[in-house]
Design a protein with these regions (language model features):
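Surface-exposed amphipathic alpha-helical tracts and adjacent flexible/coil segments at the periphery
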Residues: 1-5, 14-428, 432-597
Length: 597
């Protein structure tokens, strides 16, 4: 069977694809945000099959990196239970009215299939999750036809795709590398009813023109025993059914030709007879009705066998290594968004075990901000192959300055940092949900890993900590990392050839304080991310200083995550955690106590 990684692994570089190939995976579903250029680079530089998301709903966030559904809707989008907060109204720096800045149109790459084939794409993915069977039939039929005939869609086929489901049309913006407001849309209230189209799809199941499954039939008719019919397909399924005991012929005996003719009548089913073997003893008789019933029973049994859930194979599970658990209280670590959040008072007060600084901020440093903690560079959550030379240069600069650790949030980071003599620590983007994840990362030579903030306290406690574990205990939790810049979509800014933002009218707001406002008035800070992307933060900071539970979970590190805080506020938070001070102001306990579906 094929071992492949879904798009929830957030793989978008050839280095990430090679990393999973080394682990035995044979196919990777790359991120939906990948452009044609990105896809070609991955196809040319990795040894595994590449699958591209070609048709269906687009998540606003990089798949596998969304905390919005869990923290706001109580359902984990990272584990397939998305509550679809993207489809709700929001305002950017304004009250939420009838704007939908997170609602992307569905992707449609039907006109790009030949281009994909030429660059080496092995498979296209068509989304059918939570859709009607008729929708799946319409979409699959058109894409299969285009692939078989090696062409693009006609105007009528495009109209059928849109009628089946769309949100004010489709987009191929990611594929073309063209982001912006044109990629967004909602399902209009007056959308055409696909009733007739879906009815036609239902009727098509009954037509002979549908692709059928070739089967081999073997029938035996002998005196004194029930007749038998065995039907086999080319996928290894085989069934045998029995019929009545044949009678002695009174007038005309059954012969092999008549028996074969009866068995070959598979019309109206999903099967066609490819080969038929009939063995009939002389002087016997079976009625036409009995033979027809025998054939129907056999084909029905084969259909059930093909639809049955495959037998779950028991694979050997290697034992976990010894746990690296500690009974001591976790040591504090600190992550900042900007260098301005660091101050001598902060470093002296908390004496953190580690300080995490975005790699982009390293270029602003002339020397380490202080002594005592271990200084760690945080790699961008999202980047592309073309960015890696610049990132490698920044990593070398960080090493020369005295940084000794790197925070890894994606498997594609690993080939980027190898050979630079850094200690490797896992970030929350790796989605550590269980002990096996920790063991896997230990095999990758990581020395610690931050567990998912979707876990409950009890689940974190029960982890077999074969690797030193860290958890976020303070800060605005990241809700989304988006390829589209939400502020740019509102202001009309554009990017120049150097990737710098050029405002259309007035000063650029992309790097200024911006918020996303929901229907309740909650404001979610929008922070700029590497590559002119956007990271949406929760409206309330997580606060656990007064909850002793997080100190009794076997964690080695507890992270204070600073995003929008001033330098003074950072110092105050550290002091609160040292004093186990009670909560004040607007805050959240996250999912550590209430959990998530």
């Amino acid at each position: 069977s094929l071992a492949y990684l879904k798009d929830k692994m957030s793989l978008f570089t050839s280095g990430g694809a090679r990393e999973i190939a080394a682990d035995g995976c044979e196919r990777v579903v790359i991120a939906r945000e990948c452009s044609a250029e990105d896809t070609r680079t991955i196809c040319e530089n990795c040894p595994v099959e590449v699958e591209v998301f070609a048709h269906g709903a687009l998540c606003m966030c990089y798949s596998g990196q969304c905390g919005m559904s869990a923290l706001i809707g109580g359902r984990s989008g990272n584990r397939g239970r998305c509550a679809q907060p993207c489809r709700l109204p929001y305002g950017v720096n304004a009250p939420a009215k009838k704007a939908y800045p997170l609602s992307l149109k569905d992707s449609c790459l039907a006109g790009r299939l030949e281009e994909m084939g030429a660059m080496g794409v092995s498979c296209v993915k068509l989304e059918g999750r939570m859709k009607r069977p008729e929708y799946v039939a319409v979409i699959t039929r058109i894409y299969a036809r285009l692939l078989e005939e090696g062409r693009g869609p006609t105007a009528d086929e495009r109209a059928e795709l849109e009628q089946a489901f769309s949100r004010s049309g489709f987009t191929d913006g990611y594929w073309r590398g063209r982001h912006g407001a044109a990629m967004f849309g909602t399902r209009p209230e007056n959308a055409p009813d696909p009733k007739d189209l879906f009815e036609e799809a239902r009727r098509a199941y009954e037509r002979d023109s549908l692709r059928t499954v070739p089967v081999d039939l073997s029938c035996s008719v002998s005196a004194g025993v029930p007749c038998t019919l065995t039907v086999s397909d080319r996928d290894g399924h085989s069934v045998t059914v029995t019929g009545p005991v044949p009678e002695a012929a009174r007038t005309r005996a059954l012969d092999g030709l008549e028996l074969e003719a009866r068995l070959r009548k598979t019309g109206g089913t999903a099967f066609r007879c490819a080969d038929c073997a009939a063995q009939v003893a002389g002087g016997l008789f079976l009625s036409a009705g009995a033979l027809n019933a025998l054939r129907r029973d056999a084909l029905s049994a084969l259909e059930e066998a093909r639809c049955a859930v495959p037998h779950r194979r028991e694979l050997p599970v290697p034992p976990l290594p010894e746990a690296d658990c500690t009974a001591e209280a976790p040591r504090l670590t600190i992550s900042v968004t900007r260098l301005e959040q660091l101050s001598p008072a902060l470093l002296e007060l908390g004496c953190p075990a580690r300080v995490y600084i975005p790699l982009e901020e390293v270029s602003r440093l002339e020397s380490l901000p202080g002594e005592g903690p271990e200084w760690c560079a945080v790699l961008p959550r999202v980047w592309r192959d073309r960015d890696e030379p610049a990132l490698r240069t920044l990593l070398e600069r960080a090493r020369a300055l005295g940084f000794t650790g790197v925070l890894i949030g994606n498997l594609g980071h690993l080939p980027l940092v190898r050979g630079l003599d850094f200690h490797l620590y896992g970030d929350y983007g790796l989605n550590v949900f269980n002990s096996r994840s920790l063991a896997y990362l230990k095999d990758k030579e990581l020395e610690s890993a931050c567990v998912s903030f979707e876990l409950r306290f009890a689940q974190i406690r029960d982890l077999k900590k074969v690797l030193r574990a860290e958890a976020i205990v303070y800060g605005r939790l990241p809700l989304m990392i988006t390829e589209n810049c939400l502020v740019q979509n509102e202001t009309g800014c554009r990017l120049d050839r150097q990737g710098l933002c050029v405002p259309e009218d007035g000063p650029c707001r992309c790097g200024q304080p911006n918020v996303l406002v929901d229907r309740t008035g909650a404001a979610f800070p929008l922070l700029p991310a590497y590559g002119h992307r956007t990271e949406i933060q929760n409206s309330k900071p997580l606060y656990l200083a007064d909850r002793p539970e997080h100190r009794r979970l076997g964690l080695a590190y507890a992270r204070l995550r600073f995003t929008t805080e001033t330098a003074e506020e950072c110092v105050s938070v550290v002091q609160n955690y040292l004093d186990a001070a009670p909560a004040a102001g607007d805050f959240t306990r996250g999912l550590y106590e209430r959990g998530v579906e």
